[in-house]
């Protein structure tokens, strides 16, 4: 080996970080990270979460490192949808480089740069505060099929679905329902049948239209935790009705907890192999499931969704929930609802935990003439 080539090889072996830093990008990250939206010092921005303990202000970190020759100028978005859209267009390598610089320089130990904060010192918001669209998958776990029916009826319904899975059933959840971890779930005034559903949220990373299931993962950015809060009290009697009113049931303010972070897909793995999700109210575990209970895979749901609409970066698809919801009787033998004062904890392994308290909303102002939110549960006789 010529002396000059040998010397260059030795430098690359001894100083691999310097090699990637020359371009201000990296092919791999020395540590996994999560991304989220945070309020730090009165400013809302995106950050990378390291070790579930530190938040790196990516905008400030990028600005600081660009002052060195190793990091050429490259914009860092402060909005999560912009970050997702640019992630595979070079931004991923820059974030990797920022993380690698912090880890290899041991900057997380002892005195840390100003752009690194402890997670407990910042306010964690919903990672995508206002998604462009949220699609949810109805009854996509076998344990959730007819779970409020008698056992024999439920068994027949499950067998029929296994014999003919059909296609996924998708519906749109109001983007205005989104809240971040720690925010309050508000029970509409007079309503008494509030329910819970923990779900995996798949965050789209690339435009997708007519995507086949085997290619679906290529269009995914990452994964998050969702709770589909549901008002099972029904709609006002009379007038037009086509059955369940999912706008009342699922679309009200605070009915869409999401977060606390998004885990990029390279750090999560295949959800059909690793998904484990639980939901606890107080100290009582109400739901627990893994992907083996799913009817349609995450990839099949993306295929179906992309056959109906064009998916864009930052769109979210809920994978459905398992048995154990409040309206069901298969797990506990009787129905059970959220009440003011309850604390909901929803966890998906490798992503994180959502924590929310439930509070009752005050009565609406007099003279509004509003039937929504209704002041009674319509599936039961009016209470005097």
Enumerate the language-model features and the residues they cover:
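A generic local secondary-structure boundary/capping motif
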Residues: 24-26, 36, 123-126, 158-161, ...
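Catalytic-pocket segment enriched in acidic/His residues
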Residues: 23-30, 144, 232-384
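Non-heme Fe(II) oxygenase catalytic core, chiefly the N-lobe of the double-stranded beta-helix
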Residues: 140, 173-234
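N-terminal non-catalytic cap/leader segment that marks the start of a structured domain
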Residues: 22-164, 168, 343, 365, ...
């Amino acid at each position: 080996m010529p002396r000059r080539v040998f010397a260059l090889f030795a430098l690359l072996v001894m100083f691999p970080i310097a090699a990637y830093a020359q371009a201000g990008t990296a092919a791999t990250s020395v540590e996994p990270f999560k991304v989220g939206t945070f309020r730090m010092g009165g400013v809302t921005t995106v950050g990378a979460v390291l070790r579930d303990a530190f938040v790196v202000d990516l905008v400030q970190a990028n600005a600081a490192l660009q002052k060195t020759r190793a990091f050429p100028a490259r914009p860092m978005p402060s909005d999560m949808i912009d970050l997702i859209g640019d992630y595979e267009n070079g931004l991923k390598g820059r974030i990797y480089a920022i993380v690698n610089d912090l880890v290899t320089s041991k900057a997380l130990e002892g005195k840390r740069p100003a752009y690194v904060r402890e997670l407990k010192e910042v306010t964690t918001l919903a990672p995508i505060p206002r998604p462009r669209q949220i699609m949810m998958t109805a009854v996509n776990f076998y344990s959730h099929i007819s779970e409020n029916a008698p056992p024999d009826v439920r068994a027949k319904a499950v067998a029929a679905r296994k014999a003919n899975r059909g296609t996924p059933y998708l519906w749109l959840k109001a983007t205005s329902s989104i809240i971040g971890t720690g925010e309050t779930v508000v029970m509409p005034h007079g309503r008494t049948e509030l329910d819970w559903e923990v779900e995996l949220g798949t965050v789209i990373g690339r435009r997708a239209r007519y995507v086949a299931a085997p290619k679906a993962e290529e269009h995914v950015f990452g994964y998050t935790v969702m709770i589909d809060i549901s008002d099972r009290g029904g709609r006002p009697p009379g007038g037009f009705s086509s059955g369940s009113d999912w706008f009342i049931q699922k679309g009200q303010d605070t009915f869409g907890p999401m977060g606390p972070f998004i885990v990029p897909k390279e750090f999560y793995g295949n959800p059909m192999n690793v998904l484990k999700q639980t939901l606890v109210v107080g100290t009582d575990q109400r739901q627990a499931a893994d992907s083996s209970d799913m009817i349609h895979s995450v990839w099949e749901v993306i295929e179906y969704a992309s056959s109906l609409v064009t998916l864009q970066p930052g769109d979210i698809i809920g994978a459905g929930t398992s048995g154990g919801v409040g309206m069901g009787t298969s797990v506990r033998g009787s129905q059970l609802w959220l009440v003011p004062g309850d604390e909901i904890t929803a966890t998906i392994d490798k992503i994180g935990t959502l924590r929310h308290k439930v509070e009752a909303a005050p009565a609406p102002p007099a003279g509004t003439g509003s039937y929504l939110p209704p002041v009674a549960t319509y599936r039961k006789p009016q209470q005097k």
